Curated annotation (Swiss-Prot):
Coiled-coil intervals, chain numbering: none
Functional note: Alpha-ketoglutarate-dependent dioxygenas; part of the cluster that mediates the biosynthesis of shearones, diterpenoid pyrones (DPs) which are structurally diverse meroterpenoids consisting of a diterpene linked by a pyrone, and which may exhibit a range of bioactivities. The alpha-ketoglutarate-dependent dioxygenase esdpJ seems not to be involved in this pathway.
Protein name: Alpha-ketoglutarate-dependent dioxygenase esdpJ
Gene3D superfamilies, per database record: Clavaminate synthase-like
């Protein structure tokens, strides 16, 4: 897992300037970019759509996460197309498509690749997200993760579109409705959101910057390690719901069965940027394989502490409007939802997750700051 084959040696992709005419700003110096006025549906339907989406993918891989506001015209089908194009245009394996959640057979939505992330009981969620957080032995800090790292071929790009938001803490604002495709073009689609929601935020942390904060000597040690990633909770949830795990291919021929575990390098190379970043940390990381059990526990706690306590590598994204969209590269960031809205309404989002390559480490790859000529 720590080595590299010749097939993995590829040149990083470079921006071609196709997004330069669109207003954008960086959310923090190292992480996050927002396009406040751009419309993803228009980009997908433009004559130069592939050029736009390729530059978008590179931007996401460099900046970690990109934000778009009020994407009322981005249907689920367009969102799904976008996620696949982001990967295809940047070299994902030809047999990688969209991830199918292991619990997809419970409350199927008609599209097994659309993951309904919701706290609304009317949507019959497969899991109680508030209960899951309350049962974490380390509290909310244990929520940090990268998507589907328990799969042999984990996620490249994830796209979350928020369609229902909780009210604010004072409870003064009406509950935002989930719009039908017809209603998206009605009064709600054209209305300004007077109540700027400051709840149900999502935190992102740069896996590039975490690695850059670690000394070169300790980085070399981490680069020799692999970790076992797993998610046993889904098997427990399927039993509680009297359902079953989706054991057929989940977006890749390699992602099959009910074991829901995989071994990956602790430090991996992002093939889009050529930069290496920390990968073995957070919720799904169960064991560092080349060290003792005690060393593994201490290492897991320290790496998570690096993410939690270094605020300069974090970005807190606020979901403010219906149909706000966040797209992130799971090879570049960790993320965690903030469950601070219990009793204030429900949050529902539609997420599509692209499946990428099997993680690898190119020993010749550089950290982000090394590649950009920046040094601490």
């Amino acid at each position: 897992m720590g080595s590299i084959s010749q097939s993995h040696k590829r040149q990083p992709l470079e921006l071609q300037g196709h997004l330069a005419s669109f207003k954008a700003f960086d959310c923090t110096p190292v992480l996050g970019t927002e396009f406040p006025d751009a419309k993803l549906a228009e980009w997908l339907q433009a004559p130069n759509a592939d050029d736009l989406i390729r530059d978008l993918a590179i931007t996401i891989s460099q900046r970690g996460v990109v934000i778009f506001r009020s994407q009322v015209d981005l249907t689920d089908e367009l969102q799904k197309t976008l996620v696949q194009k982001l990967g295809e245009l940047t070299g994902k394996p030809s047999d990688s498509t969209w991830h199918i959640h292991p619990l997809a057979k419970y409350n199927p939505t008609g599209d097994s690749t659309r993951h309904l992330i919701t706290t609304d009981p009317k949507n019959k969620p497969a899991e109680d997200r508030f209960r899951n957080q309350a049962e974490q032995p380390m509290g909310v800090r244990a929520a940090w993760h990268t998507d589907i790292s328990y799969e042999p071929n984990p996620a490249d790009y994830s796209c979350l579109k928020m369609v229902q938001l909780p009210t604010n803490g004072g409870g003064k604002w009406p509950q935002l409705p989930i719009l039908t495709p017809v209603e998206r073009h009605g009064t709600m689609a054209n209305a300004k959101c007077a109540n700027s929601i400051e709840q149900s935020d999502t935190l992102y942390a740069s896996s590039y910057e975490v690695l850059d904060k670690i000394s070169p000597a300790y980085r070399k040690f981490l680069e020799t390690l692999t970790a076992t990633f797993a998610q046993p909770r889904y098997n427990q949830s399927s039993q509680e719901k009297k359902s079953e795990i989706h054991v057929e291919p989940r977006g890749s021929p390699n992602n099959v069965g009910s074991d829901l575990s995989a071994i990956h390098p602790v430090v991996r190379t992002n093939p889009v940027t050529g930069w290496k970043g920390l990968y073995g940390a957070g919720m799904h990381t169960r064991r560092f394989n080349e060290v003792t059990a005690d060393e593994s526990r201490r290492l897991a706690d320290w790496l998570l502490q690096m993410i939690v306590e270094n605020h300069d590598l974090q970005f807190r994204h606020s979901w403010k409007n219906p149909y706000d969209v966040a797209i992130w590269d799971n090879r570049a960031v960790f993320h965690a939802g903030i469950m601070d809205y219990k009793g204030q309404g429900h949050r529902t989002g539609h997420r599509y997750v692209g499946v990428g390559e099997q993680p690898y480490l190119d020993p010749e790859s550089k950290t982000r700051r090394e590649a950009l000529g920046e040094f601490n």
